[in-house]
Amino acid sequence: MSAFEQAAREQAARLRAEIAQHNIRYYVYDEPSITDADYDALMRELMALEAQHPELVTPDSPTQRVGAAPLAEFGSVRHAVPMLSLGNGFEDEDVLAFDKRVSDTLREAGLLGPAEQAHYFCELKLDGLAISLRYENGELVQAATRGDGQEGEDVTANIRTIRAIPLQLRAGAPAVLEVRGEVLMNRADFEKLNQKQAARGEKIFVNPRNAAAGSLRQLDPRVTAQRPLRFFAYSWGEVQGLSRDDAPAFDEASPGLVSTLPRDTHGGMLDWLAGLGLPVNVRFNHKAQGAEGLLAFYRRIGAERGSLPYDIDGLVYKVDALAAQRVLGYVARAPRWALAHKFPAEEATTELLDIEVQVGRTGAITPVARLKPVFVGGVTVTNATLHNEDEIRRKDVRIGDRVIVRRAGDVIPEVVGPVLEKRSGELPQFVMPTHCPICGSAIERLVDEAIARCTGGLFCPAQRKQTLLHAAGRKALDIEGLGEKLVEQLVDNGSLKTLADVFRLNAFELAALDRMGKKSADNLVAAIDQARRPSLGRLLFALGIRHVGETTARDVARHFGNIDAIMDADEAALLAVPDVGPVVAGSIHRFFQEAHNREVIRELEKQGVHPQAEAQLQSGDLAGKTFVLTGTMPTWSRDEATRHILAAGGKVSGSVSKKTAYVVAGEEAGSKLVKARELGVTILDEDGLKALLSQ
């Protein structure tokens, strides 16, 4: 090698190291060490040097982050160690209960003294996207989204464009290392991105998380390369190939945990990851003892939340000692040694411009607040539910008021109440209309009911549209392609008046509609044909009878066997169906007493719709047992799980009670899981459910 070539090699190495250091200062510590112009000059110098000497280009060079060619689609990646969810806490009492459970368990195991407090590692709950990075021999070889926790999407090409993520780890990296962390976008970067998007006439993102998600799921990595994404590591998955002294020994009872690692605490492991060159949020990571220590940190960060450079939606508390984590173990695919402590809903004030009413599938009249646009909880809110007339009276909300609007996460925004000191003069109270704003039919409110209803039935276009959408839904007739926009067109042009009209649709008529071509029309007609032989329970559910859910519809169908028997049944006969009470029996009886509803059944038969009898319940150990499903399961959808439970003779309910036999909890399980624990109900994960069903 000539002296000139050696000098070029050394210069390239120096530039790569300097740029990497500037990336760490900017993307990890949020403390730029040089100007953008100076940074760009370094990049140009390195690019020119590598252009002159292609043999100097390395996989981890910052010049290799510009983005590869566009992808046709994202592949799937099976996580070597599942990416688990966390239990949630919202109140101080939840944190106190968490600390008590942890402390009691550790004392029983002899890992905590009688007067000793548990030690925790606290982290910010970043509002971004969870990602798993896989390094082999120190080189980034794969990156995947969390997905369902078991399997995610392959976003390697996009992840390689993020400057905060090292393409090559420092010396000492194990043979295999899975790193878990969060991809996010700073608020300031988000604002700049939206300004650029607006200037180009392109999509404006709602919030930083939305922008980060959209950027990471670009099929063209060159677009991702232009987005200011950041990354912080907060955990690990598979680890292999450490030195003999540090070789990990995986505990099968605690997936994802190891009995030996380079460090024996969670905080120590993050220090180890940082030492390998991975970005760790050292600025805000914190150690605390006992519940009071956790709550003190929560209050501190809550006060500083608005001044943080990025969005967070809470804190995460983890038992620090890895040995203690193994003892505590898991429940329903979530660790017992960790808790996500969420911040309360965000609130803002704005003007209530109007109160309008919407008409639902069963004729329910729901008041909706039309608001002067206000940014709250990460989105711009213009509408909020007011639930019913009594709720409006209770809150004393009036058109023209300044009102408090609350939103938390993806929850529907709600009007909390008026700011009375801002009320000017005597504003009139809201009065529920006496006639439906859509069809003009009378609105009635039955005694002891909070909801007012339009009496128009299928004569009302609003109810007709919602009823038809319900009937086409996945849990009813499952007519793929018959969506909201299409139903709206077909109702408005007079093609759809009853459910039977769906089965009169033809490809020629459909192809002439807006946004419908021949292929879409043919596919829809095929889906309609497939729906001509539904189970009797699905057909009964599709009719949209008030108070009749899918489980009740199935029970009634199984009891009577055919549609004529159901139509002819009086209330006494309906009450003989298990779990059917007077309200449901009365609702079904009244529905089929209406001549036009019976006529719809006859028209369906003329169109070749012939419901099939429901399979009879098995008489095994699960016969009659009630299951409740909560959260997202790794491989089964709720419909699949429900189908398997019903096939085994079990029942599926939407609420937990003393009669519940099992709660099947997946990821992001909520209040149902909490209630199950309180009542001592047996809790299963998906694997446990499958094992139970196979017995």
Swiss-Prot record:
Taxonomic superkingdom: Bacteria
Protein name: DNA ligase
Record GO cellular component, one term: cytosol
Active-site feature positions: 125 (n6-amp-lysine intermediate)
PANTHER family: CHROMOSOME TRANSMISSION FIDELITY FACTOR 18 (PTHR23389), DNA LIGASE (PTHR23389:SF9)
Any Pfam family hit: BRCT
EC number: 6.5.1.2
UniProt: Zn(2+) binding residues: 436, 439, 454, 460
Presence of keyword DNA damage: yes
Entry's Gene Ontology molecular function annotations: DNA binding; DNA ligase (NAD+) activity; metal ion binding
Alphabetical keyword list: DNA damage, DNA repair, DNA replication, Ligase, Magnesium, Manganese, Metal-binding, NAD, Zinc
Keyword DNA damage on entry: yes
Names of required cofactors: Mg(2+); Mn(2+)
Residues noted as binding NAD(+) in the record, renumbered to the chain: 36-40, 85-86, 123, 146, 182, 318, 342
Role of this protein: DNA ligase that catalyzes the formation of phosphodiester linkages between 5'-phosphoryl and 3'-hydroxyl groups in double-stranded DNA using NAD as a coenzyme and as the energy source for the reaction. It is essential for DNA replication and repair of damaged DNA.
Family membership noted in the UniProt record: Belongs to the NAD-dependent DNA ligase family. LigA subfamily.
Gene name for this UniProt entry: ligA
Occurrences of domain BRCT (ranges): 617-695
